[in-house]
């Protein structure tokens, strides 16, 4: 599995692109699991580790009983605090004692690889607003730890994307940073006019209506090919 980095402003369709690609990929491979993580509101390592563990277990478990069993069986030194809501369709919430995590971060960072190897799966971890890790306490040390683990994973790939270009560029293109050349770097552009016109035609058709080409082109021009406003 290869690693991919995507950079573009908010509202340009990164998440939609990743979700669509994930859906198509899983339709072709029954052994593939996609884990989605959003770091928009994550401001420290403690929250990151809990969220990573929770999302990985959710993505690799078909029901909450399996999620609870995975949460217990794949940790040797950490004792996860498991919370189950009244709705069994919701994810199992996982938390740890922060002092234990600081002593044993490997167990969380290698969790996806362990599960993938044990269950014969391939896992892709998609992390939105990845540049937020640059705001953690001692970010370079944290990034070194992430890179040292993630680069060794054989059954897990990473799709890391974000909207703050200068911060993402600093993380991935600065040769002194741990994530330098971690994966294939992509810059997402605005959608070309013909594709947006086709999109308008399709959406109008879905509701039993139609739109002429000139009107569709005018809308594209007015929103400056911006995917969010085009919707």
Where are these regions (language model features)?
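P-loop NTPase nucleotide-binding core
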Residues: 2-4, 8, 12, 16-123, ...
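Short, glycine/charged-enriched secondary-structure capping and boundary segments
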Residues: 21, 50-53, 139-142, 173-177, ...
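Surface-exposed cleft-lining segments at the edges of enzyme active sites
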Residues: 94-100, 131-134, 203-204
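Helix-loop-helix "sensor" segment of P-loop NTPases
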Residues: 170-221
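The conserved phosphate-sensing helix
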Residues: 223-231
């Amino acid at each position: 599995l290869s690693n991919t980095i995507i950079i573009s402003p908010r509202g340009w369709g990164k998440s939609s692109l990743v979700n669509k690609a994930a859906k198509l990929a899983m339709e072709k491979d029954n052994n593939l699991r996609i884990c989605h993580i959003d770091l928009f509101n994550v401001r420290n390592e403690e929250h990151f580790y809990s969220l990573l563990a929770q999302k990985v277990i959710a993505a690799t478990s078909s029901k909450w009983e399996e999620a609870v069993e995975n949460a217990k069986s794949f940790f040797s030194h950490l004792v996860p605090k498991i919370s189950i809501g009244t709705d069994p369709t919701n994810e199992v919430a996982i938390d740890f004692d922060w002092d234990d995590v600081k002593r044993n971060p490997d167990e969380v960072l290698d969790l996806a690889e362990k599960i993938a190897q044990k269950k014969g799966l391939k896992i892709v971890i998609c992390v939105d607003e990845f540049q937020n890790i640059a705001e953690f306490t001692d970010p370079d040390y944290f990034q070194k730890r992430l890179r040292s683990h993630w680069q060794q994973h054989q059954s897990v790939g990473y799709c890391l994307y974000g909207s703050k270009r200068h911060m993402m560029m600093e993380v991935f293109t600065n040769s002194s940073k741990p994530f330098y050349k971690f994966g294939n770097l992509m810059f997402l552009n605005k959608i070309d006019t013909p594709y947006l016109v086709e999109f308008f035609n399709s959406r109008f058709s879905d509701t039993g209506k139609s739109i002429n080409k000139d009107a569709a082109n005018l809308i594209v021009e007015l929103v400056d090919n911006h995917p969010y406003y085009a919707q």
